Amino acid sequence: METTSLQRKFPEWMSMQSQRCATEEKACVQKSVLEDNLPFLEFPGSIVYSYEASDCSFLSEDISMRLSDGDVVGFDMEWPPIYKPGKRSRVAVIQLCVSESKCYLFHISSMSVFPQGLKMLLENKSIKKAGVGIEGDQWKLLRDFDVKLESFVELTDVANEKLKCAETWSLNGLVKHVLGKQLLKDKSIRCSNWSNFPLTEDQKLYAATDAYAGLIIYQKLGNLGDTAQVFALNKAEENLPLEMKKQLNSISEEMRDLANRFPVTCRNLETLQRVPVILKSISENLCSLRKVICGPTNTETRLKPGSSFNLLSSEDSAAAGEKEKQIGKHSTFAKIKEEPWDPELDSLVKQEEVDVFRNQVKQEKGESENEIEDNLLREDMERTCVIPSISENELQDLEQQAKEEKYNDVSHQLSEHLSPNDDENDSSYIIESDEDLEMEMLKSLENLNSDVVEPTHSTWLEMGTNGRLPPEEEDGHGNEAIKEEQEEEDHLLPEPNAKQINCLKTYFGHSSFKPVQWKVIHSVLEERRDNVVVMATGYGKSLCFQYPPVYTGKIGIVISPLISLMEDQVLQLELSNVPACLLGSAQSKNILGDVKLGKYRVIYITPEFCSGNLDLLQQLDSSIGITLIAVDEAHCISEWGHDFRSSFRMLGSLKTALPLVPVIALSATASSSIREDIISCLNLKDPQITCTGFDRPNLYLEVGRKTGNILQDLKPFLVRKASSAWEFEGPTIIYCPSRKMTEQVTAELGKLNLACRTYHAGMKISERKDVHHRFLRDEIQCVVATVAFGMGINKADIRKVIHYGAPKEMESYYQEIGRAGRDGLQSSCHLLWAPADFNTSRNLLIEIHDEKFRLYKLKMMVKMEKYLHSSQCRRRIILSHFEDKCLQKASLDIMGTEKCCDNCRPRLNHCLTANNSEDASQDFGPQAFQLLSAVDILQEKFGIGIPILFLRGSNSQRLPDKYRGHRLFGAGKEQAESWWKTLSHHLIAEGFLVEVPKENKYIKTCSLTKKGRKWLGEASSQSPPSLLLQANEEMFPRKVLLPSSNPVSPETTQHSSNQNPAGLTTKQSNLERTHSYKVPEKVSSGTNIPKKSAVMPSPGTSSSPLEPAISAQELDARTGLYARLVEARQKHANKMDVPPAILATNKVLLDMAKMRPTTVENMKQIDGVSEGKAALLAPLLEVIKHFCQVTSVQTDLLSSAKPHKEQEKSQEMEKKDCSLPQSVAVTYTLFQEKKMPLHSIAENRLLPLTAAGMHLAQAVKAGYPLDMERAGLTPETWKIIMDVIRNPPINSDMYKVKLIRMLVPENLDTYLIHMAIEILQSGSDSRTQPPCDSSRKRRFPSSAESCESCKESKEAVTETKASSSESKRKLPEWFAKGNVPSADTGSSSSMAKTKKKGLFS
């Protein structure tokens, strides 16, 4: 087809391509000999590489604080090349070089929002930013991020002014002719994808060197006096050849003389090391000199000072145009590299300047326009990495777009970008969420796993295949299980010696290590082994990395992403006389000098500081010695974690730099996959993996529904003060899913005059620090926050955590509720949610293009939804996500009790079963068939809403009329729209449906996956179709439990007398309510902020469950003293300007109220009070002395002593009664009082049968009556166990429990063995059981006796086991006597004769 006549006329710059190709070789000029083999310029200092918005803002503020007005920083930017027409790329990296020893690289592309701190720095007019083509950078930043670069210094203008010329300088040209060096312009680095995470070492050095070059060129040009200094080398080349020859001859003679004098051996090692370095330098310079003298010259390229010339070679010209900023400065067409002929704002604004410059060049050099175009084109094309092909239609569109934008958009964009309200830009399309912690993980992972991934319709349809869906394990168990460490001592580990215990008590206030703590510490001190430590919040994982350096006297490095948490821990260590510091880029030289002198034991650093200062760590290890390196919050390393931080991925270099230093990775939430990722990323060598249980028994869990009225939802958690004002019962955090919601909740609570503040990542750092500071010091009682708050808070007395909106996954939810009750006292966690809360999460999931990661996040969200809908024990659901199916003993004492969760409390009170119908699988086959068929009938063109309208027979105009005649139209009208939407969510989660995003991220269509289409085909032949799904309350409604009126203390709810657990008096049941009181308001000048509510837990219940009951007088004394201690601590903390909880935790105050020490030495006996803390808490001793003097109560009640008046009463109580732990008491009551079968109790309380049986064995040990037959201890079972115990090899040694278990048949439960042993041990003092005689038969009690004994046992429990013989249970003869003939021992008289002293008294 002939197209010549129809071929449109191309612009001149494009039609010259063929001419350029033909003359390219001839046009190539040779570089000046002065530029041959110039040494490369490299940045010699440390590079700080930051990839998180919060860290970037923090570092930027540090830079602003350290720099003075008028200071200059080297500035540069990088962005990836674009290979498609019409596309544009955003700035990926911003470089700031503040000195010759420090350069900051901010990887903006890994951040979801532009860091506020960096924006303030770039817009700071008092700090100058120097670079080449920097004006183009200004427009680029303005266009990409709405950031206006202020006080920029164009080095081209400075150089032309100083050198008295009018040159078009590139950065490389300035480096060559000002510094006598050259930049390494490797195309593979320069044109690499700067958005990919992480940057390579070559990319880092390249980027840092560019910014460094800008800084030192500015400094060099500032010191120049005139042009002669720059061109002295050129004049020497022309005028001093004879002098140079003389110098060469002289140097050669000196070299020969040195060679003759050189000794055969070097006595000094330093000499031996330095000589090769000097010789290498001389050799390199000699080689360069040879090329300069012997190399060819070209008169056309010889430098002529003072004339208008181009100092750049062709290669340099390419380097000069490597970025859009230089292209925008010097040429319109150099935009080809990023956007082929895309007339952006910067190029349009600079067009006029380019034209003026071209005319000036033509006038000066007399060149024709074609020659100018040719030269410029040659430079532009050499700058370009890839020349894309442009079609005819695309060219027309682009040119038309250029004409329209040039005249219509420039002024509009200028006025918009320069608006003074740009900080308050409201972009309605932005999802209201905490971007710093929500989107960074998604974007960083996208860059980490793949390059550019194009989402296509077919790709999304492939995501729902059978093998790729998240597996659904029963009860949430599966590969993510973690077995917890047993709390028993590891007998293979040596006990800590006296010196180690003394160090522990002196600096940390504890008298012993917890077993898992000692396991980790011993591994570090003795084995020098890497460790992965997963410990529940509040267990004490910080001691694992703080103790070793204190004990060894060396240094411990702690890496944490949380600045505020590190500051609090440094303060806490300093209060205990442990020298510690936070080392960052903004630290003074004095602190760094003290670090090098070994004056600090624990040094906290950020991941960015660590990666940029490995040489400092190596220096510290060689000079002082590093005991360990701890990586706190290590789950941030894993891309699968809920709080992925890309900066942690760079910490793998630690083991390379310091291979002999043990590394400890610590986290409170890490499943098996996350642990493996941690080990891999940190390059740990054969690490010891230690995991404790995840249970937090002091946390009460509750879930409720939002009503839409914020005050109505939150008022149940508030209490009225005496002044009729409202307040929370203790410090409270309210988590909201978006910034907008935090502000709404704060505004509503403000109507009640509550002392609450907002906290989210959109606030300035100074504002966030103020909220954090005031919350720690109890100046505000409540913080309404996004997930940006809390992870770095060191406040142990948070009593309540409320989620006003559904969390996205179990890990983050566990982490957030874990901030409550770290002092070990009772706290509560409440979650109020609505189904719409998951809509934003689903939209975010759709945007994830990595299939594996998307399905993983979907699986996590589905687990969270099941948790919210479930009627099972919420504690069990959470723990089953982290732990193994056994759910070890840490959970047994609380699970299933009224202190556990909102599901256990009503089930316990009303004897309900745990397996309610909505948690069971239901057959939704017919409905699923209808919904999938509707999606297929509508040709997968709509979202899920239209198929639901179709099934419900809606008359909505959104449904096309042509579908209304289909036989399925209206087939599902019996179900509500919300029901169908819930079913669709289940089908999406199970992989039958998939939502496919369109161009607009809020528009998505619903399509069948391969799995869904296969099932639909198979179901069409079934009648009816079957599909089992787990129903929830949306699909199987049940009564919703609203938040309790006093949810903070579920144990305070008064139950009727018949519901009290055995052994617990009414007075004991109501201790929480009795000791809950409010501290007087804190006096504050100018504010009316209420003092935090000090909720006093029962002092009796805080200790061992077996602690004897205390008198009312003692309880009153403890309560009153505790209140005064809280108030005194607050005043003392205010004077010291430290958080009260850091000065002394509530638990310490409770112990002080019980022990009432009056001397510093006695105060040291309290657990958690170190020597340093004891001295600081001395003012509290006066409060104790004054209170005890006024109330006449005894003081200095150390752990070995008891109140004198209660000692005899306590001893008497121990003889009569021994209280049961609450969980044991609940099991005993249900079994003995309510006659529930043991297997039903175990099922109802979600306990293993053996655990429930062991509860009964403990009741037997405590002396409580028990129906042995119903418990399973039948005469036959008793005989089998007794035969094993009394015969060899046991020989009645009841301490050989393990051997007994081996010899007893496996079908007998272990608890029956323990029960039999307890019976024997309780009666061993009053009778001797003869060996079993198989010819004799024991008589089992009759049913009448059993009924009588049950009745008597009930009375015994109610009366708390009165000591009279009338209330004692009548024992069966087969327990009381071992060898009575069954035929002749039926009379009641013989029974009376065999009756002995009660076994259960």
From Swiss-Prot:
Residues carrying the site annotation Interaction with DNA: W139, Y1002
Cofactor: Zn(2+); Mn(2+)
Catalytic activity reported: Couples ATP hydrolysis with the unwinding of duplex DNA by translocating in the 3'-5' direction; ATP + H2O = ADP + phosphate + H(+)
GO molecular function (one): ATP binding
Residues involved in Zn(2+) 3 binding: C873, C900, C901, C904
Keywords: ATP-binding, Chromosome, DNA damage, DNA repair, DNA-binding, Exonuclease, Helicase, Hydrolase, Isomerase, Isopeptide bond, Magnesium, Metal-binding, Multifunctional enzyme, Nuclease, Nucleotide-binding, Nucleus, Phosphoprotein, Ubl conjugation, Zinc
Residues reported to bind Zn(2+) 1: D76, E78, D210
Motif DEAH box location, chain numbering: 632-635
Gene3D superfamilies, A to Z: HRDC domain, P-loop containing nucleotide triphosphate hydrolases, Ribonuclease H-like superfamily/Ribonuclease H, Winged helix-like DNA-binding domain superfamily/Winged helix DNA-binding domain
Protein name from the UniProt record: Bifunctional 3'-5' exonuclease/ATP-dependent helicase WRN
